[in-house]
Amino acid sequence: MAGIKSLKGDRNLRGDIQAGLVLGIQSVPDGLATGVLAGLNPMNGLYAYIVGSAAGAAFTSSTMMVVQATGAMAMVISDVPAVHGGNDQARALATLSLLTGVVMLIAGFLKLGSLLRFVSNAVLVGFMSAVGVNIILGQIANLTGYAAPGDNRVIRTINTILSPTSIHWQSLIIGLATIALIVLLEHTPIGSFGLVVAVIVTSALVPILGWTDVATLHDLGFQVTAAIQWTLPSIAHVPILLVPAASLAFIALVQGAGISAMYAKSDGQRPDVSRDFIGQGVANVATALTAGMPVGGSASASALNAAAGAKTRRAPMIAAAVMILVVIVFGSAVDYLAMPALAGLLILVGYRTIRPADIQSVWKAGNVQKAVLVVTFALTMFVPLQYAVLVGVGVSVVLHVVQQSNQVTVRRRLKNEAGDTIEVDPPKEVPPGEVVVLQPYGSLFFASAPVFEEALPAITATSTGSVVIIRLRGRVELGTTFVDVLARYAAELERAGSRLFIVSVASGVMRQLKTGGVLDAVGADAIFLGDERVGAALANAREAAEAWIAQQPPR
C-alpha cells in the first residue's frame, strides 16, 4: 500500500514539475507583456506573475487555479492616472494592489460569491469583448512604432491608419511576424512554448537584420532583474484608488469564479468559491509589497497548467521558481526583447479575448440583451474601464430587477367538475358573493409590487359579500412595498363589503403583516398560518370564507 501511495506521489510530482516548467517559461514574456499592457514597468507584470502564482497556489481552494495579472485587469490599470508617472508611482501601484486584495478578502470572508449571479451574461460578454478590442488598439503604437495623437485608443488608431508614412515598417514587420509565428508554432509539437519561441526569434532578428530603430525593453529604460523592489502602500492614495480597486476586484472575482466552476479538486469536490476569493486577496496583498500589479485568477494560465499535467497546487509554486531562475540566468538577454514582438503577443491575446460565439448567443437572446451588450461595449470602449465595470454591474442589477418584476403573474385556483384543482386567469373584477383564490408567482419584492397590484381583480360597486384569498406558500419574506399593496387591497375590499384572507403565512411574513398594518386591516381570523401540510391552510381558509359569505345578508 505504501508503495502504491509513493508511486502516485511520484506521478503527481512529475506532473507538477512538468506543468511548472511549461507555465514558468511561458509566463516570463507573458508577464512582461502584461506589464507593458498596463502602461507600467514590465517588471511590475512579471513580479505579479511570480508572487501571485506562489501565494495564490498556497491559499486558494482550486487545485488548478493560477493567480496572475490578467489582460482585463491590465486594461483597467492602464486607465488609472495615479499609477502612471510621478514620484509616488510605485507606492500608488502598491496601494492599488493592496486595496484590491482587501476587497477580495472582504468578499471571501462574507461569502459574497453568490452576488455574482446578478451580473448578466450580456454585460460580461460586452465588457470582455470591448476589453479585447482595447487590448488590440492599445498596442498599435508599439506594433507600428508610431505613437499617434488622440484622446482615446480609437482615435489614436484612426490617426495611425491615416498616417501610413509615419509607421515604422520594420517594427510592424517584427510584430506581424511574431503573431504569425505564434499561430504557426502552436500547431506543432512545441505547443504552448510557441509563444516563447516566437518572441525570442523575432526579437533576435532585430540585431541580426541591423534594425536598430526597433524599440526594445532596454531602449525604453527597463531592466529585467530578479531584485524585487520592496514597496509600502500610501494612505494618501487610498481615496482616489478605491473605485479602480473595486473594479479590479470585481473583474478578478468574476474570472476566478469561472475557473472555480471549471476545475474540480483532486477529491472530486467543487472548489470553495469564497475560499478562492480569499486566496486571490492574499495574493494581492503579497504583490502589493513586492512591486507587483493587481492579480486574479487567470483562465488562460489555469488552462495551460491543467493541460501541461499539473496534479496539485505545487505546479504554480514551481512555475514561480522557474520564472525567478529564468530572470536570474537570462535577465540581461530578456532586456532586449523587442517591443513590437510583445505587442504582437498582446494583440493575439486581445483577439482571443473576443468570443464571437458568445456574442452571437447574447444577440439571439432578445432586444433587451442586445441593448445591454451594445451599451456595455460602448461604455467600455470610451469610458475609463474602472468606471465602465461598475456601470456594467449597475446595468446588470437594474436588468435583473426589471426582468424579475415583469415575471410576476397571478392565477386563480378553482376546482373543476372532476374535483381537480386547476388554475385560470383571475377575473377582471371581484364577483359578488364568491370565494376567489389567487396564487401569485414570481419574485414579490418592491419592484414587482406594482405589477402584482395591477394583476389583482378590480373592486367595483358590485364586489360585495366576497372573500379574496391570497396564497403565499413558500414566501419567507415580503417587501414593505408589497405589504402596503396588501393593506390597500384589504381596505378597498372592506369598503365594498368584502374581505381579504391571507393563507400559508410563514412566521417571517406574519411579523411583516403585523408591522405593516395588514393584520389590523383584515383581522386575526383572516390570517392562516402555513405548515408542512400542503393545501391544509387553504382548505381551512376556503371553509371559513364560505361560512362568512353564508352569514352575509342578501344584497
Feature-to-residue mapping (PLM):
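Intrinsically disordered or compositionally simple regulatory linkers and C-terminal tails
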Residues: 1, 538-555
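Transmembrane helical cores of multi-pass ion-transport proteins
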Residues: 1-415, 517
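Conserved short loop/turn motifs at secondary-structure junctions
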Residues: 39, 472-475, 530-531
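Active-site-adjacent beta-strand anchor residues
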Residues: 67, 126, 502-503, 531
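The feature marks cytosolic C-terminal regulatory regions of anion transporters and related permeases
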Residues: 224, 352-516, 546-549, 553
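Short acidic-hydrophobic, aromatic-tinged amphipathic segments that line or gate anion-handling sites
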Residues: 522-537
